[in-house]
A protein has these predicted regions:
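A broad "ordered helical/assembly scaffold" signature
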Residues: 4, 29, 44, 74-85, ...
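Alpha-helical segments in soluble extracytoplasmic regions
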Residues: 73, 80-149
Length: 188
């Protein structure tokens, strides 16, 4: 019941009852937003309604790259970076939809399959380039890891929508974290 109340306020993530202090408190363990402004807006609203909130920012440094390749290869590499952003954004929106609109596991899996198909369409062309070390190797490694995680959540068996929603949230945070680590490594 408390989880539903918190979700109606805009909370998402892993909600659990904590009685360690002697009183029962409900905590949201993780929630992701596409911008700091969105997170701050939710934080301010929840705080004004008496909900204890802490906000942490996940970011990566801006990186500049010098690529020497033909125009189509450069477009594919730029598309790869955009694909990570789109997957992170798409999963963020999907997580909110699953929780807010009470979608079924099957509906959530279809959304994940669409995100995976788009991700594949933009990143698979990079596999045809010769040499998979350096920048290309980093991009392909992150793609492989994130693709495997998306495929796992899309193909998994879940006991409930809560289990599936938790898996989606984990995948969303995993891909954002893996992408940030890749960009940080490439930025050197």
């Amino acid at each position: 019941k408390e989880a539903e109340r918190l979700r109606a306020l805009g909370a998402a993530g892993y909600i659990f009852a904590d009685s360690s202090s002697g009183e029962t408190r409900y905590r949201v363990m993780a929630s992701g937003y596409d911008s700091e402004q969105s997170a701050k807006s939710v934080k301010d609203r929840l705080t004004s309604e008496g909900v204890e909130v802490a906000m942490y920012t996940l970011s990566s440094p801006q990186a500049s790259f010098r690529v020497t390749a033909d125009k189509s290869a450069i477009e594919d590499i730029c598309g790869a970076f955009a694909a990570f952003d789109e997957a992170i954004d798409g999963l963020g929106q999907a997580v909110i939809r699953v929780d807010k609109e009470s979608l079924s596991v099957a509906d959530g899996k279809l959304i994940c399959a669409d995100i995976l198909n788009t991700f594949d369409a933009k990143l698979t062309p990079l596999e045809s380039f010769s040499g998979t070390d350096g920048t290309l190797g980093e991009i392909l490694g992150a793609y492989s890891d994130c693709r495997a995680q998306l495929d796992t959540v899309r193909g998994g068996e879940y006991q409930s929508i809560v289990d599936f929603s938790s898996a989606m949230k984990y995948t969303h945070l995993y891909i954002a974290s893996r992408y940030a680590a890749m960009v940080e490594k490439l930025a050197g």
